Amino acid sequence: MKVTILLENTVCRSDMKCEHGLSIHIAADKHNLLFDMGPNAMFLENAEQLGVDIKAVDIAFLSHAHDDHCGGLELFLKRNDRAPVYLQKEVWGEYYVVTPDKCEYAGMDKALHRFDDRFRLTEGVTVIDDELTLFSGGMGRDYWSHANDTLCEKVGDDFPKDAFRHEQDLLVTSGGRTALFAGCAHNGIVNILRRAEEILGRSPDVVFAGFHLFNPSLNAPEPRALIDAVAGELKARTNTKYYTGHCTGLQAYRELKEMLGDQIDYMSGGSVFEI
């Protein structure tokens, strides 16, 4: 399995562009996959620099409805006219960032409904084939990140906290190894790992995910106690390797690295990993 980070908040190559968002290309035994499309066309530009043919993608996935992951979806659908895109069925909700200073829509562009024939809506565990499994829901709320606190869903005239029902995660089994892909892990990376373990009967070999440990409303990482607790859970899975970035934040990554050492590394835009 070859994993290429098309877009992330940072870059490891001078010929790449970066922006707050995430897009990952996965070349597996049976499939040529795209996981998230970032906020705009930048993932396409970077793909060209990296020699990744977006037209050759045969299946795509959206981790959740936030615009830093789905903003490039329309551009993908226009560039690639054949790949189905798997979406959790709650992606069409009204998702907002709500702070004392703003109430800003951060969800899917409803104009994308014109591509409904390309979309495959999922719920719970969806086994696509022996290589690909999607899952959502059925998770606890341990190690909850308060970086989620400004994320809301509009329901009538109210803005309750987002329950992240629209978030889904992907398991890819290829070459005898299983990788877990999670966009922002709003539901908590530990909770997502536990659900993946229930499905697999073991821990995944590799994890690629943002851990949502940077709080943008405070411009600061989550408290060290939370980061240490998450690190302890990750470290206990001694045979699992982690690649993180995006909403984890650089300071939180450094703190995780202190505890996990070689068990964790950063996934900058332009990084290529052979699994």
Annotated model-derived regions:
Residues V91-Q168, K235, L260-I275:
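Metallo-beta-lactamase
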Residues M1-S14, D149-K161, H212-P223:
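Glycine-rich phosphate-binding "P-loop"
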Residues M1-L50, A163, E167-F181:
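Conserved beta-strand hairpin/beta-sheet module of binuclear metal-dependent hydrolase folds
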Residues M42-G93, E198-V207:
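Active-site metal-binding motif and surrounding structural segment of the metallo-beta-lactamase
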Residues E8-T10, M37-N40, A65, E90-V91, ...:
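Active-site metal-binding loops of divalent metal-dependent hydrolases
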Residues L34-M37, V57-H64, Y86-Q88, L180-A182, ...:
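Active-site neighborhood of phospho(di)ester-bond hydrolases with catalytic His/Asp-centered motifs
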Residues H69, A163-D169, T173-G269:
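Cap/insert and terminal regions of metallo-dependent hydrolase folds
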Residues L50, D81, F115, T238, ...:
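Short, structured coil segments at secondary-structure junctions
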